[in-house]
Design a protein with these regions (language model features):
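Active-site neighborhoods and metal-handling regions in enzymes and metal-associated proteins
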Residues: 1-591
Length: 591
């Protein structure tokens, strides 16, 4: 964003309120990855369109902080004369506060938009320099955003047990029985969608309704949601299991818990600090704990697992048709990032089962592929050129499962450098796919396997290797991940991505991604530990033109041949004619 009039108006509003500065996070009141248009405050002020970031604006300075996924994108979208663009690890917001605020300064924040943990960290940083962190419930951006969109109004639907695998009544009973408090406040819409077996359309790509809930150890749950969005069948579904209230009633209900001196559990990593403040001020005994839905939601039941398999076969057919089309059209020229992304979306739509995409397709041609979470726009849209690589990361929401797949494709003849880097990324992906590991193993213990071949050549990538994936829910789901620091044990039923990458700035990007399901593995002869492993769900050919066979071991080549044989069998049975002929060639054994 090069128009700085919004920044000037925002500073004028801060001065009017006698604030030194203000924190602007990407999050909304529900801390999800995707937000409704009304909550795109960070984008409106700065121009940054990524899914994670935080800005701090004072009367004289401004900075925006992003992680490694967005270091290139933020410089392209934000006026770097007006905003410092900083890496959150190298220069976190708290350190910036300590450097730039002084004694007596007041730093404002919206307590619905920062979690309890985040507010504590910012408060500690302010205290260090004698400044004060001040909650402001009337967001100053909302005061100057004259054309701010309204709140979402789309209808809510039920998620039938034929897809959910368990009734909402059973889930809520289990949650109440496992509670170590009188009540627990749920603030994450995907947790609420899972536990109540409902789905919504309030944010892009993730089928959730924006809502809060209070679970009680004794008595019905309370669900705080816009009742106008609930058709009669959904109200009938909820009536036996919940008291439905309007969103504005959350504060009175929290205060009622306080008057009872109830012990109330919140997750400080996701609950807005405002909720904690209301509870404490009202007299509740607040206890911190993880969202009680996180682990049971992540451990898919047998119905959800089978749904994921069916969804990935369906998605594999769409991907095969897309890759066949791409191989025919790319040599002719005329393709652009947007036209390719649109074609893939059309092929998924043609399945007749698509509910939505699971995220905004990342379609990066040449240098744009070097930005791991590049978001193509009409302004940035680039043609696909001969001699470049094209990275496409996409996914779908089907009622029986969520998909996420990345493939890197050559446009013309790849260079030796491209083939070397691609093969090293492939080796990492195969290493994760093949590993068997003992119960209790965390993603951080496996992460090195994906990076080892790149490390041997002095390379790495600045993102995690894998994230959890929901069941017709968020494509990025906790609590388990595969990265350098995660400490959550992997358990059967969890679905994660397996996506190592390599990025050469201003040149090209490479990523290969499959989804995998954690399952109990066969015992190892002579071993005494119960072992787990991964079942690969994604069914999509990996481009052999980018593979340097001399870098693959016999075991790696065998894995890839077996994988392609499975793709051909499960996807090929649903293709015919030229598309099937193409798939047979794409899945042929390596020479």
């Amino acid at each position: 964003m090069k128009d700085l009039s919004r920044l000037a108006a925002f500073r004028a509003e801060l001065a009017r309120r006698k604030l030194t500065g203000f924190i602007i996070p990407r999050q909304d009141e529900f801390q999800g990855e995707y937000v409704a248009p009304y909550a795109e405050r960070l984008r409106w002020l700065t121009g940054f369109a990524g899914s994670w970031g935080t800005a701090i604006v004072t009367l004289r300075k401004a900075a925006i902080f992003v992680d490694g996924r967005y270091t290139l994108q933020v410089r392209q979208q934000v006026d770097t004369q007006a905003f410092e663009t900083l890496h959150l690890v190298d220069e976190p917001p708290t350190k910036w506060i300590e450097k730039n605020l002084r004694k007596g300064n007041t730093l404002g924040f919206d307590p619905w938009l920062l979690t309890a943990n985040e507010a504590d960290r910012f408060a500690a940083a302010c205290t260090k320099v004698g400044a004060k962190l001040v909650p402001i419930t009337s967001n100053p951006i909302d005061a100057i955003w004259k054309e701010q969109p309204g709140r979402p109004t789309a209808s809510v639907a039920t998620q039938p047990t034929q897809f959910a695998g368990r009734s909402a009544a059973d889930k809520l009973k289990d949650l109440a029985g496992s509670m170590d408090a009188d009540a627990a406040v749920l603030t994450m819409p995907d947790s609420i969608a899972w536990s109540f077996n409902i789905r919504g359309q309030d944010v892009p790509y993730t089928p959730v309704a924006l809502a809060y809930a209070i679970l009680h150890r004794k008595g019905k749950a309370e669900l705080f949601i816009d009742v106008a969005k609930l058709p009669e069948d959904v109200q009938a579904h909820l009536r036996p299991i919940a008291i439905v209230r309007e969103p504005a009633e959350i504060e009175p209900s929290l205060k009622a818990l306080g008057r009872k001196k109830a012990q109330v559990r919140i997750d400080p990593s996701s609950a807005p600090s405002r909720i904690r403040d209301i509870l404490k001020k009202a007299g509740a005994r607040v206890v911190h704990g993880t969202d009680p839905c996180l682990l049971p939601k992540a451990k898919k039941n047998s119905i959800e697992q089978e749904g994921a398999r069916v969804a990935h076969v369906r998605d594999g057919v769409a991907m095969a048709r897309f890759l066949y089309w791409f191989d025919r059209e790319a040599p002719n020229g005329g393709l652009t990032e947007l036209s390719v992304a649109t074609k893939l979306a059309q092929l998924r739509e043609a399945t007749g089962m698509l509910m939505d995409l699971s995220f905004n397709t990342i379609a990066g041609a040449g240098p744009n592929g070097a930005s791991p979470h590049y978001a193509v726009t009409t302004e940035s849209n680039q043609p696909l050129k001969q001699g470049e690589l094209f990275l496409i990361d996409s996914g779908a929401q089907y009622q029986d499962g969520t998909t996420d797949v990345t493939r890197t494709l050559p446009v013309g003849e790849p260079t030796e450098e491209m083939r070397d880097r691609f093969t090293r990324v492939l080796k990492g992906m195969i290493a994760i796919s093949r590993i068997r590991f003992p119960e209790g193993t965390c993603g951080s213990q496996l992460d090195v396997l994906a990076r080892a071949s790149l490390w041997r050549s002095g390379f790495d990538y600045d993102h995690g290797t894998g994230h959890g994936v929901g069941s017709y829910l968020s494509v990025h789901e906790g609590p388990a991940r595969i990265n350098k620091s995660d400490r959550t044990p992997l358990e059967p039923g969890m679905i994660l991505s397996n996506e190592p990458g390599f990025y050469k700035p201003d040149s090209f990007g490479i990523r290969i991604e499959n989804l995998v399901l954690v399952h109990e593995a066969k015992a190892i002869n002579g071993g005494d530990r119960k072992m787990l492993g991964f079942e690969t769900l994604t069914l999509c050919p990996i481009d052999r033109r980018l593979i340097d066979l001399s870098l693959l071991t016999r075991e790696e080549s065998e894995w890839l041949d077996n994988y392609h044989a499975r793709v051909l069998k499960e996807v090929g049975d649903r293709l015919d004619g030229a598309e099937l002929k193409w798939l047979r060639q794409a899945c042929a054994p390596l020479d």
